[in-house]
Design a protein with these regions (language model features):
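Conserved catalytic or metal-liganding residues and their short signature motifs at active sites
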Residues: 1-224, 228-234, 248, 265-272, ...
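Binding-cleft/active-site segments that stabilize strongly anionic ligands or cofactors
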Residues: 238-269, 274
Length: 319
């Protein structure tokens, strides 16, 4: 008699619970926050971790895993929004984790880059590119600008080294495929292209700007590029170049005071800026001044340059 009662109770329990389990199995989740499973957890620890994140009841989860013969969860971050529980669990079993992306932009310097990585889901194990294996004697401006994909908890060093290796490969191919039109070596090309990158308002002007700087270098004139002063003041630049900054001989990036190129790039260069310098020749212009946010006026003489500055109502120091 007792045996029959137990069997009846179990049958009724299953009959009552099964529809609820089926409902949970197929109900889409509305939680925005993803689930994260740490690396190295056993299946039981992973179940506890998932249940702790208010994803699903632990008993039901074990029931589902048992009947679907699932014995492992893979570590990583999983999107659950709008997905039924069954799909989420199969994702965790197969390792279909969320893919993040990080955009390494041209014009970015190592300070910007460090902040970008700290704000991402990457582990920043490469502060200010300290980990990069490189032939260059500087760490600034040695990355290939592009979008890179990764998983939460991945090491930044892997992406950064990959980015650097892409740039190195591009520069090697450029160097061996053709002769550049000037006497700059690859280090110098990368340095000058970073200045062109920060000065140019649009891609169409890059060859002209490169031509101005190459012309000045050929004539042993100082580059007098404002972005180099700014870089030398980082990370404490307050947004305003003062006359004292222009006259500062202690700023080794101050091209108003130093001869030739600064000791390193001042940012990541776009491919178009690198090409503009690599294929550039000394141009007919020696000066330029911004006449809008995206374009410049170019001059052959200092007098013409000063007249344009006056016409635009700009306050540029005369040096």
């Amino acid at each position: 008699m007792l045996y029959k009662l137990v069997i009846t109770f179990l049958v009724l329990s299953i009959a009552l619970i099964a529809p609820y389990f089926a409902y949970l199995e197929h109900k889409p989740y509305s939680k925005d926050e993803p689930i994260y499973i740490k690396d190295g957890l056993s299946i039981n620890d992973a179940i506890s971790e998932v249940a702790k994140q208010n994803f699903v009841n632990k008993v039901f989860l074990k029931y589902f895993l048992y009947f679907n013969k699932i014995k492992t969860f893979k570590s990583g971050e999983y999107d659950i929004y709008g997905k039924p529980m069954s799909e989420i669990i199969f994702d965790m079993n197969e390792g279909n984790t969320i893919t993040h992306k990080i955009l390494i932009n041209e014009g970015t310097n190592i300070y910007d880059l460090n902040n970008l990585i700290n704000d991402s889901m990457l582990v920043n194990d490469c502060q200010f590119l300290s980990c990069i294996r490189t032939d260059f004697n500087f760490k600034e401006g040695i990355l290939y600008p592009d979008t890179y994909f990764y998983k939460k908890g991945n090491l930044a060093s892997n992406i950064l080294q990959k980015s650097h290796d892409r740039l190195k490969k591009y520069l090697d191919e450029l160097k061996y495929s053709q002769n550049n039109n000037n006497n700059l070596d690859i280090n110098e090309i990368l340095i000058l292209s970073s200045i062109v990158e920060k000065e140019a308002g649009n891609n169409n002007e890059k060859k002209l700007i490169a031509g101005v700087f190459l012309n000045r270098l050929e004539k042993n004139m100082r580059l007098q590029a404002d972005p180099t002063i700014i870089y030398g003041l980082l990370p404490n630049f307050d947004g305003d170049i003062k006359k004292s900054n222009i006259l500062d001989r202690n700023n080794k990036y101050n091209t108003y005071m130093i001869n030739g190129l600064p000791p390193s790039p001042i940012a990541i260069s776009s491919i178009s800026s690198i090409d503009a310098v690599f294929n550039g020749k000394p141009g007919k212009f020696l000066y330029f001044v911004a006449d809008s946010k995206t374009s410049h006026y170019f001059s052959k003489t200092y007098e013409e340059h000063l007249n344009k500055i006056k016409e635009l109502g700009l306050n540029k120091w005369k040096l």
